């Protein structure tokens, strides 16, 4: 069926805003198509999704003109009940989606509403839990899970409903690399088995292209810039021009001078012909040179129950100005480690900070040494307005109004938030809220800054601005610790990586060496970047190609 979902000359403006967010949209999606929606933060892609699932106009009010239909019916005339049977949504923020007290109850919620028999309900819940590898979590509270585990629970909760339209709002944001690849494979299988019209809003382009996508729609400033096949999009400069991170191998091949015009298939490295490509001389890998030791963590163990340690006798050192990535699969203990370092949870570690034993710090004392930016911005925000949230730490420390205004404006500009300085935080997107929380910590200038998934939900422009800013802090002597699932970030912007698996440090090395260890990657759910696959095709050392790429395009300031 053609035009299953259709927008004709569609414009939408929120009541709280002076300009339309969507401007004259013309887009048709046939039944059963799989479409990727791209765009920088604030481009209108999430607003389009909210129109589709009924959040607009039922929750977010505004004015619209033009036509928007689902299955040839005016979408805004459909009741919430009717819309819920048409569209199932996996939200960007999984905490906003939970209903049940346990994982099993949450997955079963839609089935309960449809009065499914209890025995059949239990069977369906168990099936989806196994397929998403969350069966051991069925009795746990969703709020107690890691970010990636929460996303899997949210996904299971909508997949049980068999809706004809599946909407995924950044489903990979909190998933480790291998789990992200697995989820995209699962989404593709569901798309084919159920013939569901599948719409994916996502920044992690390289991971989405792991499976086939019928079409890509690129948004910018509320308008459609590109609407067509993925292969043709990758031949253009639209991605970099409009703030979307290109697949690593595409960026590398552009720097190598590869002629894309003769290339038909762009989404698979295996389909490229490199017989005429000239490879420049590439230097050996830069190894990390330790500076002065800043923090020594000794024998850190954390247990949430009497039987199992979430962290088991973890010891490591941090150095001044170092950029460290902490990586590992979902639930490995990465966020628990950060919380323990900040004294948020009880632990028995010995911490030596600048040659002083600070093991008995209060939370306030520890906060003056180590700043922590949480993965979920909603857990940090306490003020109604953007300016007040970023200024709060300075006000509590007695800074003058003039000094506060100057420093807040400076940090808001760095974080790409200056235009929102007088906005209510409730009007911001999830990615914009994330930048607000990062700004509120960075403004206090702590010597160690821990960031849990600092770039999740960020477009390329704000990703680059944020990482360049963190690079500058590193050059100024700050130690930057990033908990991340982003292997490209780890390669470009860190000097060292610690891999955690089941509460243990299983590797501590240069990021390139980590990604060269195939057995380690498989065990810990990490994944080589496409630079390694490209190096294999080119017949050169992946270490040299990665170092060459970093020299030409990556983080250089550290």
Curated annotation (Swiss-Prot):
Its main location: membrane. ATP 1 binds at residues 39-46. GO terms for molecular function: ATP binding; ATP hydrolysis activity; ATPase-coupled transmembrane transporter activity. GO terms for cellular component: ATP-binding cassette (ABC) transporter complex. Keywords: ATP-binding, Cell membrane, Membrane, Nucleotide-binding, Repeat, Translocase, Transport. Its EC number is 7.-.-.-. This is Putative ABC transporter ATP-binding protein SAG1633. The keyword Oxidoreductase does not apply. It is a peripheral membrane protein. It is an enzyme of class 7 (translocase). Residues 5-246, 295-527 form the ABC transporter domain. Belongs to the ABC transporter superfamily. Probably part of an ABC transporter complex. Responsible for energy coupling to the transport system. PANTHER family: ABC TRANSPORTER ATP-BINDING PROTEIN BC_2655-RELATED, HEAVY METAL TRANSPORTER. ATP 2 binds at residues 328-335. Signal peptide: none annotated. InterPro entries: AAA+_ATPase, ABC_Co_transporter, ABC_transporter-like_ATP-bd, ABC_transporter-like_CS, ABC_transpr_CbiO/EcfA_su, ECF_ABC_transporter_ATP-bd, P-loop_NTPase. CDD domains: ABC_cobalt_CbiO_domain1. It comes from Streptococcus agalactiae serotype V (strain ATCC BAA-611 / 2603 V/R). Pfam families: ABC_tran, DUF3744. It is found in: Cell membrane.
């Amino acid at each position: 069926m053609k035009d299953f979902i259709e927008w004709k000359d569609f414009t939408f403006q929120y009541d709280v805003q002076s300009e339309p967010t969507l401007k004259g949209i013309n887009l048709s999606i046939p039944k059963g198509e799989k479409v990727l929606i791209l765009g920088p933060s604030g481009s209108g892609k999430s607003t389009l999704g909210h129109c589709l699932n009924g959040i607009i106009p039922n929750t977010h009010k505004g004015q619209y003109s033009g036509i928007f239909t689902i299955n040839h019916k005016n979408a805004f005339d459909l009741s919430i009940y009717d819309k819920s049977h048409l569209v199932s949504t996996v939200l960007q923020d999984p905490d906003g989606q939970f209903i049940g007290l346990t994982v099993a109850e949450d997955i079963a919620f839609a089935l309960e509403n449809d009065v499914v028999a209890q025995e059949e309900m239990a069977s369906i819940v168990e099936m989806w839990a196994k397929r998403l590898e969350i069966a051991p979590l069925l009795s746990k509270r969703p709020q107690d899970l890691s970010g990636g585990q929460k996303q899997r629970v949210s996904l299971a909760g909508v997949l049980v409903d068999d809706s004809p339209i599946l909407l995924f709002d950044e489903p990979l944001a909190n998933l480790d690399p291998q789990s992200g690849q697995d989820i995209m494979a699962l989404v593709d299988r569901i798309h084919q088995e159920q013939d569901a019209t599948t719409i994916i809003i996502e920044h992690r382009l390289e991971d989405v292209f792991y499976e086939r996508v019928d079409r890509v729609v690129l948004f910018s400033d509320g308008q459609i810039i590109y609407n067509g096949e993925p292969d043709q999009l990758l031949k253009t400069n639209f991605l970099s021009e409009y703030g979307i991170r290109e697949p690593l191998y595409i960026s590398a091949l552009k720097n190598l001078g590869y002629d894309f015009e003769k290339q038909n298939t762009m989404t698979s490295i295996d389909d490229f012909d490199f017989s005429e490509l000239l490879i420049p001389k590439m230097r050996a890998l830069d190894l990390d040179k330790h500076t002065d030791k800043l923090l020594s963590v000794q024998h850190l163990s954390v247990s949430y129950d009497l039987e199992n340690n979430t962290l088991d006798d973890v010891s490591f050192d941090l150095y001044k100005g170092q950029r460290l990535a902490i990586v590992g699969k979902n639930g490995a203990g990465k966020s628990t480690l950060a919380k323990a370092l900040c004294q948020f949870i009880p632990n028995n570690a010995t911490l030596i900070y600048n040659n002083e034993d600070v093991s008995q710090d209060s939370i306030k004392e520890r906060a003056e040494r180590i700043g922590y930016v949480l993965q979920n911005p909603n857990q940090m925000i306490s003020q109604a307005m953007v300016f007040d949230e970023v200024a709060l730490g300075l006000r509590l420390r007695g800074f003058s109004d003039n000094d506060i205004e100057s420093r807040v404006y400076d940090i808001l500009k760095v974080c790409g938030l200056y235009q929102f300085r007088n906005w209510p935080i409730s009007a911001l997107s999830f990615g914009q809220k994330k930048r607000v929380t990062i700004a509120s910590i960075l403004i206090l200038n702590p010597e160690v800054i821990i960031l849990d998934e600092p770039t999740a939900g960020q477009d390329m422009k704000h990703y680059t601005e944020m990482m360049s800013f963190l690079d500058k802090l590193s050059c100024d002597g700050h130690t930057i610790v990033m908990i991340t699932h982003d292997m490209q970030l780890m390669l470009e912007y860190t000097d060292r990586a610690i891999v955690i698996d089941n509460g243990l440090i299983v590797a501590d090395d240069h990021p390139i060496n980590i990604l060269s260890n195939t057995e380690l990657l498989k065990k810990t759910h990490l994944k080589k970047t496409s630079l390694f696959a490209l190096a294999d095709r080119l017949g050169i050392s992946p270490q040299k190609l990665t170092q060459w790429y970093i020299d030409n395009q990556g983080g250089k300031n550290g």
